Amino acid sequence: MFDPASFVEEIGPQLRQKLGNEKVLAAVSGGVDSTTAAVLAYNLLGDKVIPVLVDTGFLRKNEAEKIKDYLSNILPNLIIVDKKETFISEIEGIDDAEMKRKRFRELFYSTISSLMKKFNARYLMQGTIAADWVETQGGIKTQHNVLVQIGIDTEKEWGFTLIEPLADLYKNEVRELARYLKLPKEISERQPFPGPGLLVRAVGKLTREKLEVVREANDIVEKYLDPFNYSQYFAVSFESYGNLVNLDGIDAFLYKARATGVKGDVRAYGNIAKIECSNINNVKNIIDTLVKYDITHVLCTLDERNSGKYSVAIRAVTTEDFMTADYVRIPKEILSKISSEILQKIPNVKEVLYDVTSKPPATIEFE
């Protein structure tokens, strides 16, 4: 059983010995992993730790300002660096999920490298956890913060040495550590958020319009589902284009957009399918059939209209360790409220869907 006090007692001397009087740049995304790593280091080493949040343009609605406010007392020297236009303009137009993640990684660490030179820091601390490197090593999807574990020499590539104090912990253990370190609950209980952020929730080719659709939709989903404390919940958006097919007697709509999944222990990159289902609790047999046909995510229609360009899918799961997960059976009235507000507030959304796929065969995120 994980004991956060023992963990801090053990890792403290290791960090002090390794880092000495060197400056450390701590990359903070606002998520629980990176923030816990930064606070752990700051508590141990003080002002030698320089926490930095890079605003990539892929953060949630008003996120940079919220993070600054949440952390004002525990990371008072947090620096926010605005790189929105750099990231969006460089990745705009890329449609492959892995290419988007890898381009994000290149831009992110080039930015970090420049900041480290500016602050004369030799070490980079980040919040990589066990689930990140397990997925990357397994080829399921590239986690932008997994470097050393896949043979990338950070000294040679970008001129810094990487420190990852949480690399052997899983999400539930990181949350325990965050509570022990007295992080505000807005951080310790915060929704998991991928390093590339909304980039991987704007499924398929990145456009500025799609990015703003998913930013607004995600905000609505979080507002309604926050009280339920599900393990993870969010929205994704993609173009509504596709075609009807019949697979083993099942009518399905296959979108042109594709999404990641897991088959065995390896990555799958397959179709997103929509089915008509009157009861989201009773779709297992349909999903078992469809995943044989290169389908990674199965969605049910919640609400739709004749106009609009984009589909918005709601994703909510329960999980202990994020290595496997089950989709949540959200009450119908809650889903109805969410879908109604999305259609009301975002004019270019054609339909709202609910993801009824567990992990495996789907990954939690779509990209």
Curated annotation (Swiss-Prot):
- Per the UniProt entry, the Enzyme Commission number(s) are 6.3.5.2
Q: In which pathway does it act?
A: Purine metabolism; GMP biosynthesis; GMP from XMP (L-Gln route): step 1/1
Which terms are listed as keywords in the entry?
ATP-binding, GMP biosynthesis, Ligase, Nucleotide-binding, Purine biosynthesis
For this protein, what is any one GO molecular function term? ATP binding
CDD domains, alphabetically?
GMP_synthase_C (cd01997)
Binding sites annotated in the UniProt record for ATP: S29, G30, G31, V32, D33, S34, T35
Domain of life according to the entry: Archaea
Q: Which reaction does it catalyse?
A: XMP + L-glutamine + ATP + H2O = GMP + L-glutamate + AMP + diphosphate + 2 H(+)
Instruction: List the InterPro entries.
Output: GMP_synth_C, GMP_synthase_B, GMPS_ATP_PPase_dom, NAD/GMP_synthase, Rossmann-like_a/b/a_fold
Q: Which residues cross the membrane?
A: none
Q: Which residues form the GMPS ATP-PPase domain?
A: 2-190
Q: What does this protein do?
A: Catalyzes the synthesis of GMP from XMP.
Quaternary organization: Heterodimer composed of a glutamine amidotransferase subunit (A) and a GMP-binding subunit (B).
Write down what this protein is called.
GMP synthase [glutamine-hydrolyzing] subunit B
Phylogenetic lineage: Archaea, Thermoproteota, Thermoprotei, Sulfolobales, Sulfolobaceae
Q: Which gene encodes it?
A: guaAB
